[in-house]
Curated annotation (Swiss-Prot):
Binding site for NADP(+): R54, S55, D56, S183, G184, A185, T186, A187, V188, T189, R207, S208
GO cellular component: cytosol; peptidoglycan-based cell wall; plasma membrane
Species per Swiss-Prot/TrEMBL record: Mycobacterium tuberculosis (strain ATCC 25618 / H37Rv)
Residues at which FAD binds: S15, E36, T44, W45, D46, L47, D56, V104
Lineage: Bacteria, Bacillati, Actinomycetota, Actinomycetes, Mycobacteriales
InterPro entries in UniProt: FAD-binding_MO (IPR051820), FAD/NAD-bd_sf (IPR036188), Flavin_mOase-like (IPR020946)
Record annotation: effect of changing Y84C: ETH-resistant
UniProt cofactor(s): FAD
Protein name: FAD-containing monooxygenase EthA
Record flagged with keyword Protein biosynthesis: no
Induction entry: Repressed by the transcriptional regulator EthR.
Deletion phenotype: Inactivation of this gene leads to a strong resistance to ETH.
Record flagged with keyword NADP: yes
EC number: 1.14.13.-
Amino acid sequence: MTEHLDVVIVGAGISGVSAAWHLQDRCPTKSYAILEKRESMGGTWDLFRYPGIRSDSDMYTLGFRFRPWTGRQAIADGKPILEYVKSTAAMYGIDRHIRFHHKVISADWSTAENRWTVHIQSHGTLSALTCEFLFLCSGYYNYDEGYSPRFAGSEDFVGPIIHPQHWPEDLDYDAKNIVVIGSGATAVTLVPALADSGAKHVTMLQRSPTYIVSQPDRDGIAEKLNRWLPETMAYTAVRWKNVLRQAAVYSACQKWPRRMRKMFLSLIQRQLPEGYDVRKHFGPHYNPWDQRLCLVPNGDLFRAIRHGKVEVVTDTIERFTATGIRLNSGRELPADIIITATGLNLQLFGGATATIDGQQVDITTTMAYKGMMLSGIPNMAYTVGYTNASWTLKADLVSEFVCRLLNYMDDNGFDTVVVERPGSDVEERPFMEFTPGYVLRSLDELPKQGSRTPWRLNQNYLRDIRLIRRGKIDDEGLRFAKRPAPVGV
């Protein structure tokens, strides 16, 4: 007999742990399992193993709302973040619900039975289980393959070419010349870490620059409050301080982009040698927050540049050579190792497909509702975090809403909920109003968002608190239904 559960959660990273905790806390009678395709939990924090891996936002907002972050670092390294996620799962018994090596291949919705059949591959064997509600918490990255553009002459290079998503544990880079291609969060994390841990010299080669902000890796206010207040109270206070600060910076960038650009470049200039061409190497041709700001703790990247361990080169690649990279300017960069920190590939729902009564779902024709459900797909929610703030802020809100939704359905005898696509008064817009390369490459494969609430993705935690945490469940956009009574009853 096929196993049946009330809820199936896909993914055992931060989003999956949040979903499970909220289910246990707010829907304690619901049975559930977490399906994780990898051999261990932690998602991003277990997958990425490159030197220097760390958070790119503070842990008081990246941490769960329900469990305080107690580490000393506000900008934390990957290992303690992974331990935090794992220990949270163990503390609340969530780890007992995780089924590892369970890759979801497809999910089929039956209107007649009001349930999903989830098809799974585990150790080469196919199986299935059914559930009332499907909660997709696998993020939007392709965990199997990062983005690596084709570079002319790459076959000529005699050294290793490595993508950070697949970092070899035995890579020896001591006293080596390294070129890191890229300018995003991965590159600005890797470059100073490599320079400080044995590399002879590191070059960050970028086609165009990114806005970079330096921030202390410790929070002085948090340290004081932790001495004066109970743990949970101190954590909540610092969390709100940082939420409001993030919102204020983002709002200022939207209102006064030129002024904020000038301020960011001025702050960078103070940390670099006199005469350094900040505009060329750290002055993007777009406004702040059109793409995510990159964070460097304690100015580590700028310190490495000052000490001569790191050089930033802004140029384009002609081809790889046997001993490095030839640029279109004619310059050649010597390299023993080349690292392609060139981005990620987007992949919603872990690559799983969905059908409704045998008909394939084309998610590109759907519209997102509150950034967590898709039009026309019954009894399904997904978690995608913020692009301009910590991922977990949105993950916790989505988990809260799903629990409120399930309880509302139980209280009113409903078996299904589906998002109805709005009429022509709501204009279609791209799923993300965000322009990094990994998003632009995949926009045609993503759902749409709408021009107004609740179809518009706010990217605003304060607005989402009103909309998601405090808003009505039975509002515009959702249609609830009860299973028809059997004939003769």
